[in-house]
């Protein structure tokens, strides 16, 4: 059983307007569900997911039609990526720049950037992109997920952003010469999506 926050919803046009596709994310793991819902919950509502059954405020809402989890992906730290992070077309690999710190200290607490940027930003961004949302909106949703995760560590968002920004400026100054090699084969450009817009908060 888990708790998921609604981040978006649309009418299911294939069901004559009588059901809705609801997207919700559990920021802790993180994991994502798409729900075939009989009513329209507000964005920000908390859903309870038990198996494939979904409820809102103790009342049945619908069924899970799709589920994705951080457990389904791997994070690669092997490549020189100018814009720090990105993801493969199939969503099975998250990429973080090899020169970006994997941990840093914010307000006396260690923060894993593999978790905060890789799994709590890049991954939700990919989930939203796969649902047809354009980059700026997917990025906005992902930044909100990242913020919830960071604050759950007892770190302020401003303190975290200041530390990320300091390190991003250093990474931005590097030239992306090549993507390197993985498993003995070079990665073709059409198999890699880099986050080409600046990382903004």
Kindly give the residue locations of the regions a language model identified.
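Active-site recognition of the HExxH zinc-binding catalytic motif
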Residues: 117-129
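Flexible glycine-rich surface loops and low-complexity tracts that mediate binding to linear polymers
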Residues: 44-53
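Beta-strand/loop nucleic-acid-binding surfaces
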Residues: 28-41
């Amino acid at each position: 059983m888990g708790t998921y926050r609604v981040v978006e919803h649309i009418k299911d046009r294939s069901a004559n307007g009588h059901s809705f596709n609801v997207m919700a994310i559990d920021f802790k793991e993180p994991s994502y569900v798409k729900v075939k819902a009989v009513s329209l919950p507000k964005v920000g509502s908390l859903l309870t997911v038990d198996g494939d059954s979904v409820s809102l405020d103790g009342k049945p809402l619908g069924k899970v039609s799709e589920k994705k989890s951080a457990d389904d992906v791997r994070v690669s730290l092997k490549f020189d990526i100018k814009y720090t992070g990105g993801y493969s077309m199939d969503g099975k690999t998250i990429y973080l720049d090899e020169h970006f710190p994997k941990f840093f200290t914010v307000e006396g607490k260690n923060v894993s950037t593999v978790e905060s940027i890789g799994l709590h930003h890049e991954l939700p961004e990919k989930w939203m992109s796969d649902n047809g949302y354009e980059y700026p909106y997917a990025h906005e949703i992902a930044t909100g997920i990242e913020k919830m995760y960071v604050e759950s560590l007892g770190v302020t968002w401003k303190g975290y952003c200041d530390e990320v920004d300091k390190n991003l400026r250093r990474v931005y100054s590097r030239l992306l010469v090549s993507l390197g090699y993985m498993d003995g084969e070079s990665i073709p450009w059409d198999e890699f999506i880099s986050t080409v817009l600046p990382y903004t908060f």
